[in-house]
Amino acid sequence: MVSSDRPVSLEDEVSHSMKEMIGGCCVCSDERGWAENPLVYCDGHGCSVAVHQACYGIVQVPTGPWFCRKCESQERAARVRCELCPHKDGALKRTDNGGWAHVVCALYIPEVQFANVSTMEPIVLQSVPHDRYNKTCYICDEQGRESKAATGACMTCNKHGCRQAFHVTCAQFAGLLCEEEGNGADNVQYCGYCKYHFSKLKKSKRGSNRSYDQSLSDSSSHSQDKHHEKEKKKYKEKDKHKQKHKKQPEPSPALVPSLTVTTEKTYTSTSNNSISGSLKRLEDTTARFTNANFQEVSAHTSSGKDVSETRGSEGKGKKSSAHSSGQRGRKPGGGRNPGTTVSAASPFPQGSFSGTPGSVKSSSGSSVQSPQDFLSFTDSDLRNDSYSHSQQSSATKDVHKGESGSQEGGVNSFSTLIGLPSTSAVTSQPKSFENSPGDLGNSSLPTAGYKRAQTSGIEEETVKEKKRKGNKQSKHGPGRPKGNKNQENVSHLSVSSASPTSSVASAAGSITSSSLQKSPTLLRNGSLQSLSVGSSPVGSEISMQYRHDGACPTTTFSELLNAIHNGIYNSNDVAVSFPNVVSGSGSSTPVSSSHLPQQSSGHLQQVGALSPSAVSSAAPAVATTQANTLSGSSLSQAPSHMYGNRSNSSMAALIAQSENNQTDQDLGDNSRNLVGRGSSPRGSLSPRSPVSSLQIRYDQPGNSSLENLPPVAASIEQLLERQWSEGQQFLLEQGTPSDILGMLKSLHQLQVENRRLEEQIKNLTAKKERLQLLNAQLSVPFPTITANPSPSHQIHTFSAQTAPTTDSLNSSKSPHIGNSFLPDNSLPVLNQDLTSSGQSTSSSSALSTPPPAGQSPAQQGSGVSGVQQVNGVTVGALASGMQPVTSTIPAVSAVGGIIGALPGNQLAINGIVGALNGVMQTPVTMSQNPTPLTHTTVPPNATHPMPATLTNSASGLGLLSDQQRQILIHQQQFQQLLNSQQLTPEQHQAFLYQLMQHHHQQHHQPELQQLQIPGPTQIPINNLLAGTQAPPLHTATTNPFLTIHGDNASQKVARLSDKTGPVAQEKS
């Protein structure tokens, strides 16, 4: 039940390939916890339950105290007992019949089920056959607990034909439970064996690939146990061999296992299957790498004596990878590069890395590190290995021989793959043999542990190396590397990156891995320049120092180019692009990416990247990798937590957008980079060399600081995409098993899908919140004022039919809009809307007598300049005619009088007089004519559409109530009056006032009182007439009835909007 991320310690694996279920989690017995699957302890008094979140079905681990179900129930301990076994302690959960049962009992008895698989409760016992309850536990019998032997239900030995039965918890305490891989990839079979068959099975399992493991992830990684054991033996043998050649202390045994562990972890994170296969190959092909990897070299500055030792060891060690580690181990403190500092010997000797990439021991000093430390390989260590390796390779022609080839290429590539974040400065001066402080000091501290999946890549590389050995020898005659001897140009790489993560790690590693393999001659002209990447603790500064014994340090890129022409590959710029990382080794890629910058990824130096140069030894080759001086910032950095802290995450990061992008530069096109640099055709010589894939080109002098380096990728995603695509092609070229590619692809797809789902969840969550908010708003009841429910819908329909000049009645959705005169420009509303709003509105809402004008601040509506209510009659005047505005008076329950239409420009009725029952409004549309209201009076002969339509649709009148019919009749009379005689503005208003007052008194006095609206008589006629004396809004000749004094009108509008604002907001 433990998450598949679980790391497996080597010691555990070696001691027992099948995990016995003892100690730790009450369910799975594992004592470790992970961030994604923590081990949770019950805080109940006297309770010792400890369970993994996944093992106990804890949906979310609380931040405070956590209690198991038993403690949570507060039931007396005496009453809580498992129905499947005699034991009372442990992780219990409720059963469907109200009892209790252990989670582990439920897992191992096949017929028991969980009602809810995610919470793992309740435990369903109804399907358990009665026969299980009749069995007796042979373990209880053996231990003298005969009384309890028949208690509960027993499981049986998983061995076919064996009839032994025992309680699950008894078997757990005896260590007889295990998990086997089921038929499907994701299936786990929980089973147990009697002691006899378990011990027998255990012996057979040690030699077999099939792994019995506690967890799925472990099961896959366990398949490699036998390999690890063999490797361990090999390591020991090699270590002995090393001792002969070297005075270095033998690596402590603890170191070896921990290293191995690392490897395993890495594998598990990447792809267990492919890895195990590759491990086999590695063992077969390159046992030589292994001991070097494990050996810890104490870093003592080497005097000339050490150097000589180194040479001797190289000569002897050609055939055994061990020698490489020895070289690295000693850093010549003296010698020509006295300045170089060596911190610990790099754990990986050049070739050594291949055996177990994980095994890199980055610890500075000889101390053994815990598996976690190993997990975090320090990039510098790896890098160092690759460098020293390169030194050796150049120094010894023999290196090319099978071993050396594997060492050089494999080790370098691997070590580089691992790129270590090294905390301490690593100075690797692979001088040609002479001073070669071959040991790159991996002074790098163990640095944060990266769990990387690099191993598979390493294995692949070792295989590749074998393939290439022949090529290398032919291409780079073994003699060439020797040529380098003379020159001390050993590059002295001092990479001190204060931030472990930032240090150059993966880029160089991956690059070198492939490139080094190919070119033992990396140092070929001795030209390795010593890049000293001294990254200050900040890691921002990476200074490259080129030391060429023969050649003067080249500071300019042109010189580098020349050197390249001479045949030296500039391992260009791996650092940033890391495409090589991928290319270096398929699986290693993830690792390198994880290293990738975490804080100052800028440090990545592409040290190992020097690819074998095809150059003649004579040329003073400057071409060494230019340390990519990118500071963390220029290099697209991924926060450290993003990559590398978890094994899976490193893979994922690597994979990250891989698939879609075309590789900018195909690996296949190895020569591409080199050629671009003007390298001689020979430069492209190792077609596979990942160096070619390096994408970053530094046009600036290598020493230049970050600003000179062109940013390679705008974002880490682009960088990773490039890496991925190039690595993919590289793997294809190498004939790497497709399963690695397939797994990487599937991981990438899963990651993309996961991101998509996360986005979807975010969007849905936001949508849900919006809907909840809207629901809350809508749940507030609308205050409905229904004084005179009248068949308003009929009237609205009628009005819609009768207003020929209007498109449709616009009614605002709020039922109270009747109160407001505010224009609603946007919503043409269906008649149904009108009816519904009209019915729910009080017929008098629009007609209510307004409070005194002075009480509210002036406010002007956009479409209606002024609105004046006179004892419930609303008069609207259009203030501005700049653009056609449809101002709608919200539907009210009864049809009011409509005053006048201006004949000339088909203006819809400008003013609306609402009878007390309500206002039937027609939109007041302004023509484009800026002063549409300039017509002072309505000519007597003007035809008024409204009265005509009213008479034409007289059939509709029958449907109206008496009250409404009266209103319409008054309307017609009023229109006729206007037609027959010219009225002065005062007469108009007086007439209108009387009409309204009459209706108001007759019908709506009770209504108004109910609504607590001031009486109709509060507004004296003088106030009404005052508007005519004030200057009109438009022209002096404007009809005062149509244009009411601006102040009065705006104040009314303000009041109306104040009343209806909240309602409108609620509705919207």
Swiss-Prot record:
CDD domains (UniProt xref): CC_AF10, ePHD_AF10, PHD_AF10_AF17
Outcome, altering residue 106 to V: Impairs interaction with histone H3
Chain positions covered by the region annotation Disordered: 206-260, 291-505, 583-612, 660-708, 800-865
Keyword Membrane: no
Annotated GO MF terms: chromatin binding; DNA binding; histone binding; nucleosome binding; zinc ion binding
Keyword Transmembrane helix found: no
Gene giving rise to this polypeptide: MLLT10
Disulfide bonds: none
Listed Basic and acidic residues bias regions: 223-240, 306-317
Disorder this protein is connected to according to its UniProt record: A chromosomal aberration involving MLLT10 is associated with acute leukemias. Translocation t(10;11)(p12;q23) with KMT2A/MLL1. The result is a rogue activator protein.
A family per Pfam: zf-HC5HC2H_2
Lineage, broadest ranks: Eukaryota, Metazoa, Chordata, Craniata, Vertebrata
Ranges of compositional bias, category Basic residues: 465-483
Subunit architecture: Self-associates. Interacts with FSTL3 isoform 2; the interaction enhances MLLT10 in vitro transcriptional activity and self-association. Interacts with YEATS4. Interacts with SS18. Interacts with DOT1L; this interaction also occurs with the KMT2A/MLL1 fusion protein. Interacts with histone H3; interaction is necessary for MLLT10 binding to nucleosomes; interaction is inhibited by histone H3 'Lys-27' methylations (H3K27me1, H3K27me2 and H3K27me3) amd acetylation; interaction stabilizes association of MLLT10 at chromatin; interaction is essential for histone H3 'Lys-79' dimethylation (H3K79me2).
Tissue expression from the record: Expressed abundantly in testis.
Site residues by UniProt (KMT2A/MLL1 fusion point (in acute myeloid leukemia patient A)): 664
The protein's name: Protein AF-10
Stretches for region Interaction with FSTL3: 141-233
Modified residues (Phosphoserine): 217, 252, 436, 532, 684, 686, 689
InterPro entries referenced in this protein's UniProt entry, alphabetically: AF10-like_CC (IPR049773), AF10/AF17_PHD (IPR049781), AF10_ePHD (IPR049775), EPHD (IPR034732), Histone_Mod_Regulator (IPR050701), Zinc_finger_PHD-type_CS (IPR019786), Znf_FYVE_PHD (IPR011011), Znf_PHD (IPR001965)
Location of region: DNA-binding: 311-674
Subcellular location: Nucleus
Effect of residue 120 to A: Impairs interaction with histone H3
Sorted UniProt keywords: Chromosomal rearrangement, DNA-binding, Isopeptide bond, Metal-binding, Nucleus, Phosphoprotein, Proto-oncogene, Repeat, Transcription, Transcription regulation, Ubl conjugation, Zinc, Zinc-finger
Region (Leucine-zipper): 750-778
Ranges for region Self-association: 80-287
